Amino acid sequence: MPIISRIGSKSWKVRLVYFTISLLLTLGAVTMLYPLMLMLAGSARSEADTDSIKPYPQFWFDDVVLFQKYVESKHRGDLEKVERAWAKRIGSWRRIARPDDDTTYLADFLAWRDKCEWWYLGHWDAWRLLAINGRAFRQQLHERFNGDIFAFRDEMGVPLKSWTKVGPPNPQLHQRYPLERVGMVGAFADFARTRPTRDRVLFNPDGHFWSKYLLPKYGTIEQYNEAHGTEHTSYRQVFLSRFVPENELEREAWETFVRTELFLGHIRLSPDLRDAYQRELAKKYGQRIEEYNKVHPGRDYTSFDQTPLPTSLPERRDEWVDWEDFIKNHEACPAEGIEVHGPRQQFESFVAQRRGVALETVTPIRLPIAAADWRDCMHNSGHLRWEFTTRNYKYVLDYILHHGNGIRNTIIYCVLAVGLALLVNPLAAYALSSSFALFEALSDGGWRGIARKVSASKTTKLEYV
């Protein structure tokens, strides 16, 4: 029977009471759900959107925030790497906006970038969490070694105790020498070639030149213009030229950076420097060709006149130091014999050939890396939103599954708890009811009373239990 009768419920006062109760219950539910939604939204945040306090992930509906998280993920959560790739000052993830780069050569760039040989894979590590490519690489190794961490350790030479510690090797960006592709480095290089081209981060020597040399020395573009007598509006108009500039200050900056900082794979030497290279080798090894042969196994030269000059980074690693020492020597290796041949120079040659024009008519071309990143992000927005929503959960689940026996122990505990509850409780209830009947029978006539009770309650006892 209801507390309020049907007749009473027709009164507007009663209806107002109903409405008030419903409103209070709804508000109570909201006060419980809103913090839960904030917590769930927070579980999908990263450094790029950590300031967002909303009951839903902001990147679900905001393309700019999605792009910020995309750039953060692609560049391993390192803002300096983004600035070097884009060759521009950013300062904060929240300041990243839709690029306003010139898209004249964007289509050419998208057609060329899979031919570029200088890149590393992105989307694998950010803020101590493995991103999609990092998780895929770990899974590939896990399947390759059938989950045997000891077999993995023996072959790769990495002393790790758990699969949760397995991840891609650090690429050590902007070092002078390329990494030797053995062990984990080789395995990751093979894996990287199987991933989409859009996940590649291209090396940008112009950005490296700006961040490593120009920015620390001159600071603002106004100070650079004052020193060089130029009228650039930003550092994006300053390039690392293919050949040494004629301007004295520009020449000094170019030589310092190219000779001491630039990745050796981006340097080409003129064949005319062969005699100078041979003289430098003879001087370095004390005019003793046998010493040179000893340092370079497999060589059997009888004179330094037989030693070749590699015009690009030698294939043999034991020749790299000799080659670099020669480049650093201002007297032996004149700057006019050095050429920079990096991704931009390769792209400029591609554009000139594709359009059938002279190279001089298109140079220099600023690599539209930021514009390509925006295009890739927008073309894969659905996949990226799902990845950023579930990434943290996937990482935690992967950690639990591959770290100890937590899942197995939990399953065993749950099975035993449920099984014992279903088995012990009925048995205890049956035993309790039997004890009660026995006590009642004893108090009602001893063993004869027991016999009467058993006969009378033969069926009802089962129902009771």
What residue spans do the PLM features occupy?
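Alpha-helical transmembrane signal-anchor/signal-peptide segments
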Residues: L40-P57, D78
